[in-house]
Amino acid sequence: MYYQLDTGDDCDNNCYNNRLSLLYFSILLMLMGQLDSVSNVIADRLVYYRERGARAYGPMAYFLSVFLLQLPILVFNVLFYTIGMYPLTGLRAGSSYYGYFFFFMLMSSYCGMFMAYSVASIAKSTQVALSYFPAVLVFVMFYAGYAVYIPEMDDWQGKWLPYLSFFRFAFQGMVLNEFQDNDDLPKSHDYINKLGFDFISVSGCCGIMILFTCIFASFFYLAIRYIDFEER
């Protein structure tokens, strides 16, 4: 289905829809890969509480250890996935387009990781955290603009809920990167308008993804600093 996607005047609606689904589910794959992070944080939490109580290290040291250790792993995972998938599927040629694609995939991984860490940090047990994470994931998935296009959402939903979904901005950035001013996809402008992705640029989506990552990272840091489920 996704091997060397069609282009040109012969490209029908399936050609565009296949591209949208490929981009959407690529992001979802990165987020689902962070599910193990929930149980990992809770498993490490007892050690962190003990060491913090002994003044061996504080929340910032723990936060940095998590962040810095995961950085090369996520970069490798995203690179391994994208460097093969991108040419095989025939997505838009050009190093700059691949660079944006890689960026959004990497930032989706980071957002997903810190989202999982944030959920785990406010949950008392693994079971509770694993019930929170799917609920948050479904929310950001639904308001990404794929299952229901943003202009087709109810007024009160479409006006502000999509702005709370980092998934939406990763998806929008990747769609614009693939569709915008692409002569090989004659109907691309119509699809951009139909999705409601016509008023924030690719670079704007990059900035918003960085902002969301910082928000989730800050929330996680504040949670490990001030919440202690083992406190007596």
Write out the residue ranges for each language-model feature.
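Membrane-spanning alpha-helical segments of multipass transporters and channels
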Residues: 1-232
